[in-house]
Amino acid sequence: MLEDSFLISHCVRFDIKGRKYIDTPQKYYFEDLGLRNARLGFRQVEETHLMENLIYNELKMRGYIVDVGVVPTRTKETDGTYNRSLLEVDFVCNRGSERIYVQSAYRLPTEEKKQQETASLLKIDDSFRKVVITEDLVKRHMDDNGVEWVNIYDFLMSSEV
């Protein structure tokens, strides 16, 4: 009902390695952050969620079809067993033949946090662009792993991701 009134929209989960959509819970985003804040009585002002919602809205406005990505991964434990898990990519953006993987990271104060935010992007074995958008004041650049880093303000002011 709320989707029919254009108050919220949803993202479907997409298995990046398996290249198929997954029937798991979808993520929902508000079309208007002001209405979201008013509905919540301005009590839940979580910058991380607001920034992710803002990036989603901007990507949709730029004409992308936006999904949430998941990357299956296996890690070897100290006892020799393997642990399977799913890592999330905030947005898988498609427009024609163009695809971009976007990770929203509000602040990255430590190297450990940077590794945590890029882990899912680095597990993707294709040549499409991988971008981290952060509130930190970073100059747009590409790191040694091929991940682009963009400040949220530069992202919003630029016409490209």
Regions flagged by a language model, labelled:
Residues V66, R129-K130:
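Hydrophobic anchor at the start of a short beta-strand
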Residues M1-R99:
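Accessory nucleic acid-recognition modules appended to NTPase machines
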Residues D90, N94-T110, E117:
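Active-site ExK catalytic segment of metal-dependent nucleases
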Residues R19-K20, N83, L122, K139-H141:
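Short secondary-structure boundary/capping segments
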Residues L40, E112-K113, H141-D143:
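Short glycine-/acidic-enriched loop or helix-start segments at secondary-structure transitions
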Residues L137-V161:
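Domain-level recognition of nuclease-like catalytic cores that cleave nucleotide substrates
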Residues R107, E112-R129:
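Short, charged, amphipathic alpha-helix that recurs within catalytic cores of restriction-modification
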Residues T134:
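Short beta-strand/turn micro-motifs composed of small residues
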